[in-house]
Every structure is written in structure tokens, then in C-alpha cells.
């Protein structure tokens, strides 16, 4: 979780009674909370024009926040505005627009407040375990060296999908374990109702586009807390079923409500719970997750993996009330199966090498088997993403980008080169470089078609007039930081470079749709 330095300084100097009793609701009336939310997340059109809309010099004054919370609780005005908006259209009624703006503004500030107890406990746990922040590898590519080191000795792999909550009240119950402030929980339920109501009401493409541009810090926090609840069950079973202490499970905070459920489970099942844990013992169990997809690999047998699947699904559904679909959890043998994870198709390849050894007059053959984790960039999904972003057709034929023809030539070149560089950089760990060459070819000629369309010319005439040096940035070599040797080595995207390179500065996967 991202730790805000200014929030921690606020906690250090704020010694109010509500903070000591975990009362978060009064923080909603503090102006600096909304300035923090504005600095971090609000980069949309809502906060570029709030002064003209509301007529306030301060965008989030104390009086405004009080009025926002008061009007959110007035259900009659909301219902009347909805009925009127159905007649006049969505943008025809200001009260309806403002009511959504109220909930959006308060929810983002509420998201900043909810992170305060989590951030303080996370920092204290890091200080107790003496874990330097510089040693926390945030790069996504740092996962692949871990897979190369561990997965070569495993037998089975199971790809999981994080189950879906069957009701929004489950999210409130998750946060109820951490927050003892009743008004904050009531406000949380109200925000859930607002989001559910607006999502079901807004159906036009313009409205969806407008509200989808908002970066919802509040919703990201809820999703992370929900995923943490799902993962905590796995780590609890893993810790209880192993004699050894887990060394790669990361940092997890203390929970109380979960142990109450486990105690109730032990009372119901009597001694069968410990018998179940005995059947789940496996010292070579590895778990990796990114967003909503996870990989569970083991050196055990197929029966052991099926037991883990059975107990995880039943615990999720029976005791945590999470809806899970068992048929979507696939268990495959690692040597005969390629799993999709983090934009790669990964599999373990076996290479056999026959060596002839001769001792005196006797000679014999030695069969040496080596294993290697093979990662391949999925060409079909990449072309599908480029097709959705209108860079090519479904078959991979480059097309022009009409919405970029109003930009300058330098901006068009910069956008195409940046997308090409990001894609080739992220998929630099692919063992088959032909996929990168094809992606680069699509973006290069899509850029040429876009420039030719802007200047009302053909691609051949345009390229002949300006020369081949126009698109030379697509072929420029890039200096990369080697993961093994801390030195810079040239990485030619167009050359015969066969080695896989993992970067240490890629912290998220960029969606191509965001560039359009």
C-alpha cells in the first residue's frame, strides 16, 4: 500500500481524542484531507472547473464539505432529481450532476482517511522487521527471476481467479474489523449505495466516459482490502499446515475478526480441522498474484493440489461468503502446460543433452536434462489490444489513427514511439523476438499512415518526400540495466539479441486504451 508522508506527519502532530479511539469520521471535516486527495488523484475535468460551478474560492472548504455530507443523506432530493433527469436527460439537471459530484468528492477524501490506520500499522511493522524500503522490489519484472529460480523444481501449477463478493455489505464487514467508528461505517454504506445507483443509471457512452476518467482512490483501497481478505485465508492455512516458517509471504497485519471465525470453525469441526491441515502440508508451495489473477505452484502430487483447491473454495464460500467458481481453477502439470500471467505465456522446457564419456577402454553415454522457464509474448492478445486502440485491424494490418491527425508531427511521432518503446520494453523477456518485430512493424506503418493522412498524401509519396530517417526512432538502440550485472548494455530492438532482459523500474502494466 502506498504510504503518504504527509498523512504520517499529520498523524504525528494530531493528538486528538477521536484519533486515539480510531474515530475517523471527524477527519472528513478537515480541509487538508481533500487537498491531499486532490494532489494525488484528481486530475480530471471535475476539479478543473469547480470554482465556476460552486462559486467558492476554496475548492474544498469546511462549509462545503459539511453541505456535501448533509445533502448526500437527503434521499428525497436525490430521487426527485433522478425522476427529473429521466425526462430532461442526464446533463439537463444540475442537482443530479452535483449529487454525483458530492459523493465522488467525499468518497475520495474518505479513501485517504481509511488509509491512515493501515499506513501507520504498515510502517510500524516494517520498522519492527527492519525491512528497508529500498529492498522492496516494486518492479513487475522482478517476479520472473523468482519464477525462474523456483518453478523449475515444481510439478503442478494452478491458476486462480480472486472470487467475487456476492454483496457490497461484505466489503463493509471486512473494514469493520479495522474500523470501530460507527458513523464512518454508515457513510461507507451510503457511498456504496451511491456508486451502485449511478452505475446502474448511467447508460450513455458520454456519461460513462466522463465518469470513467476519475481515478477512484476509494475504490482501489476497497479492492486491495478485499484481495487481502482472500489471500489471508491462504496464508493462514499455509502457516498452520507447515512446520517451517514462511519466508516469502510478505508483510501482513494483525487480524482479530478472522481468528474468531477460525475458532468457531474449530468448535464446529472439533478435531477435524487439524486433520485437514495435516493433509495440506507441503514445504514447496509458492504463491504469486497480480491484480485479480494468482498462480499457486507445488512440488506435491495432483491429489494435494486438488485438496488445496477444494478447501480454498469451501472456506471462501462458507466462512467468508465469497462467491468462487471451482471450474475456473485449472490444475495442470507444469511441464505440459503453459500458463498466462503478467502478459506472458510461461512454461517449463526440458532440454536433453547426450554426452559421450570415455574412461580407458570403456565408453558410455550420459543423458543430461536441463530445465528452463520459457516466456513468450502472446501475439494474438497484443494484436487484439492494438486493434482495440485502432492501430491495426483484427488481422494485424496497420491502419491510420484519425483522432491524432489534429496533433503536430512531433507529437504524433512521440506518441507512437513511446507506445512502441513501452511494449518492446515490457516484453523484452520474451524468448521469441519475432513478436516484438511484428508489433514494431504495425506501429511504424500506423504512424506513417497517420502522418500521410494528416498531410493528405499516400504513404509511399510521404515517405519518399521526407526520407527514411523520419521513423528512425523506432530502430534506435536502448540502454538497459542488466539485472545480473549492474552495468548498461545495448539492447537493439531490430538486431539479433536473443537474451531475455527484465527491468527493475516497471511498476504497472500500461493499457493501450489510455493512450488513445
UniProtKB/Swiss-Prot annotation:
The UniProt record lists the keyword Nucleotide-binding: no
Keyword tRNA processing: yes
GO cellular component, one term: chloroplast
Any one of the GO BP annotations: tRNA processing
InterPro entries: Domain_X, Maturase_MatK, Maturase_MatK_N
Superkingdom classification of source: Eukaryota
Keyword vocabulary terms for this entry: Chloroplast, mRNA processing, Plastid, RNA-binding, tRNA processing
Pfam families in UniProt: Intron_maturas2, MatK_N
Molecular-function GO term, any one: RNA binding
Compartments (UniProt record): Plastid, Chloroplast
Signal peptide limits: none
Family the entry assigns: Belongs to the intron maturase 2 family. MatK subfamily.
Protein purpose: Usually encoded in the trnK tRNA gene intron. Probably assists in splicing its own and other chloroplast group II introns.
Full protein name: Maturase K
Annotated source species: Cypripedium calceolus
Gene of this entry: matK
Amino acid at each position: 500500500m502506498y504510504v503518504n508522508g504527509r498523512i504520517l506527519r499529520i498523524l504525528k502532530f494530531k493528538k486528538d481524542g477521536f484519533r486515539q479511539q480510531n474515530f475517523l469520521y471527524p477527519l472528513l471535516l478537515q480541509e487538508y484531507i481533500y487537498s491531499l486527495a486532490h494532489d494525488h488523484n484528481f486530475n480530471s475535468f471535475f476539479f478543473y472547473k469547480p470554482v465556476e460551478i460552486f462559486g467558492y474560492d476554496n475548492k474544498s472548504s469546511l462549509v462545503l464539505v459539511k453541505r456535501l455530507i448533509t445533502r448526500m443523506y437527503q434521499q428525497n432530493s436525490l430521487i426527485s432529481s433522478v425522476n427529473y433527469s429521466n425526462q430532461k436527460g442526464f446533463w439537463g439537471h444540475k442537482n443530479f450532476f452535483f449529487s454525483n459530484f458530492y459523493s465522488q468528492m467525499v468518497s475520495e477524501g474518505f479513501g485517504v482517511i481509511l488509509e491512515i490506520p493501515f499506513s501507520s500499522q504498515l510502517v510500524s511493522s516494517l520498522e519492527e522487521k527492519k525491512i528497508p524500503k529500498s529492498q522492496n522490489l516494486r518492479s513487475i519484472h522482478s517476479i520472473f527471476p523468482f519464477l525462474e529460480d523456483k518453478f523449475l523444481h515444481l510439478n503442478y501449477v494452478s491458476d486462480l481467479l480472486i472470487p467475487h463478493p456476492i454483496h457490497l455489505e461484505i466489503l463493509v464487514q471486512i473494514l469493520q474489523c479495522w474500523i470501530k467508528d460507527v458513523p464512518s461505517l454508515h457513510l461507507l454504506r451510503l457511498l456504496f449505495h451511491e456508486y451502485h445507483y449511478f452505475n446502474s443509471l448511467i447508460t450513455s457512452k458520454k456519461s460513462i466516459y466522463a465518469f470513467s476518467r476519475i481515478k477512484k482512490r476509494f475504490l482501489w483501497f476497497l479492492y486491495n482490502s478485499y484481495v487481502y481478505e482472500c489471500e489471508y485465508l491462504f496464508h493462514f492455512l499455509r502457516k498452520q499446515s507447515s512446520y517451517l516458517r514462511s519466508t516469502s509471504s510478505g508483510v501482513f497485519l494483525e487480524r482479530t475478526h478472522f481468528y474468531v471465525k477460525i475458532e468457531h470453525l474449530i468448535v464446529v469441526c472439533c478435531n477435524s480441522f487439524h486433520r485437514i491441515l495435516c493433509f495440506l502440508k507441503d514445504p514447496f508451495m509458492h504463491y504469486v498474484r497480480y491484480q485479480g489473477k494468482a498462480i499457486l505452484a507445488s512440488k506435491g502430487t495432483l491429489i494435494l493440489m486438488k485438496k488445496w483447491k477444494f478447501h480454498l473454495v469451501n472456506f471462501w464460500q462458507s466462512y467468508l461468503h465469497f462467491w468462487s467458481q471451482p471450474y475456473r481453477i485449472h490444475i495442470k502439470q507444469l511441464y505440459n502446460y503453459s500458463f498466462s500471467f503478467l502478459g506472458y505465456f510461461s512454461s517449463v522446457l526440458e532440454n536433453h543433452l547426450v554426452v559421450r564419456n570415455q574412461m580407458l577402454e570403456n565408453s558410455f553415454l550420459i543423458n543430461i536434462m536441463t530445465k528452463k522457464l520459457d516466456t513468450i509474448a502472446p501475439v494474438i492478445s497484443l494484436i487484439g489490444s492494438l486493434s482495440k486502440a485502432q492501430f491495426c485491424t483484427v488481422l494485424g494490418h496497420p491502419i491510420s489513427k484519425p483522432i491524432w491527425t489534429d496533433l503536430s508531427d512531433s507529437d504524433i511521432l512521440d506518441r507512437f514511439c513511446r507506445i512502441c518503446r513501452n511494449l518492446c520494453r515490457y516484453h523484452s523477456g520474451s524468448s521469441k523476438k519475432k513478436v516484438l518485430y511484428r508489433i514494431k512493424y504495425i506501429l511504424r506503418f500506423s504512424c506513417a499512415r497517420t502522418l500521410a493522412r494528416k498531410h493528405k498524401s499516400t504513404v509511399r509519396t510521404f515517405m519518399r518526400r521526407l526520407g527514411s530517417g523520419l521513423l528512425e526512432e523506432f530502430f534506435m538502440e536502448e540502454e538497459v540495466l542488466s539485472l545480473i550485472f549492474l552495468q548498461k548494455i545495448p539492447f537493439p530492438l531490430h538486431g539479433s539479441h536473443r537474451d531475455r532482459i527484465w527491468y527493475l523500474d516497471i511498476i504497472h502494466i500500461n493499457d493501450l486504451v489510455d493512450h488513445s
